């Protein structure tokens, strides 16, 4: 897999969300996490939602706690939000936003809902299975084809405005399998580190 820590996000925030992302992303990167999304909403008063993950795509409660403790003081100093807010740190979840090229590679074969900023084959919204990914675009096999449409569509990464995995049984199975493999790899790494210390 490519070095995802250096890989830019394809879909980024605007306005105050962008300012918050600029403040916290270096902190997350320094801790070995990737920023997925920042969203400030009026939910439950005012809520600042930060989605992040490890480079291997996993995230646990302890990771969320560590991130919260690291970014809270930075946000307090920079003070980008004028009102009081609740900080909520979470994983992207199984039906996650797709924000990096590696997300499309990692989840190839799964259903995704996509919106573009420009017309692609006379549409801005697509739904289908990711069947191919290259440096500049990805190919979707549409799950619903309108009259006169091709069964596949190539969507350029630079046209993306939103993309999200669609929850299916296959996605749940593969996400759980990937999480289990990542945890096993981390445990093996810890065992090797402990053996080196002896």
From Swiss-Prot:
**Is this entry keyworded 4Fe-4S?**
no
What cellular component terms from Gene Ontology apply here?
Answer: cytosol
Its gene name is: rimP
Q: Where in the cell is it found?
A: Cytoplasm
From the Swiss-Prot or TrEMBL record, give the protein name.
Answer: Ribosome maturation factor RimP
Q: Please name the Pfam families in this protein's record.
A: DUF150_C, RimP_N
Keyword annotations of the record: Cytoplasm, Ribosome biogenesis
Tell me which Gene Ontology terms the entry assigns under biological process: ribosomal small subunit assembly; translation
Quick check: keyword Cytoplasm in the entry?
yes
Q: Where is it predominantly found?
A: cytoplasm
């Amino acid at each position: 897999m490519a070095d995802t820590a250096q890989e830019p996000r394809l879909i980024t925030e605007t306005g105050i969300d962008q300012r918050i992302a600029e403040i916290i992303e270096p902190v997350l990167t320094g801790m070995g996490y990737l920023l997925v999304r920042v969203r400030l909403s009026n939910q439950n008063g005012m809520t600042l939602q930060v989605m992040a993950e490890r480079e291997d795509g996993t995230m646990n409660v302890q990771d969320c706690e560590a991130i919260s403790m690291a970014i809270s003081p930075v946000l307090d100093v920079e003070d980008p939000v004028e009102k009081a807010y609740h900080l909520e740190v979470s994983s992207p979840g199984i039906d996650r936003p797709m924000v990096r090229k590696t997300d499309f590679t990692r989840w190839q074969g799964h259903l995704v809902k996509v919106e573009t900023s420009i017309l692609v084959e006379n549409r801005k919204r697509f739904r289908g299975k990711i069947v191919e990914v290259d440096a500049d675009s990805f190919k979707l096999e549409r799950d619903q084809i309108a009259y006169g449409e091709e069964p596949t569509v190539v969507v350029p990464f630079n046209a993306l405005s939103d993309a999200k995995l669609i929850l299916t049984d296959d996605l749940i199975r593969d996400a759980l399998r990937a999480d289990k493999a990542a945890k096993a790899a981390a445990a093996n790494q810890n065992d090797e580190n402990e053996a080196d210390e002896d």
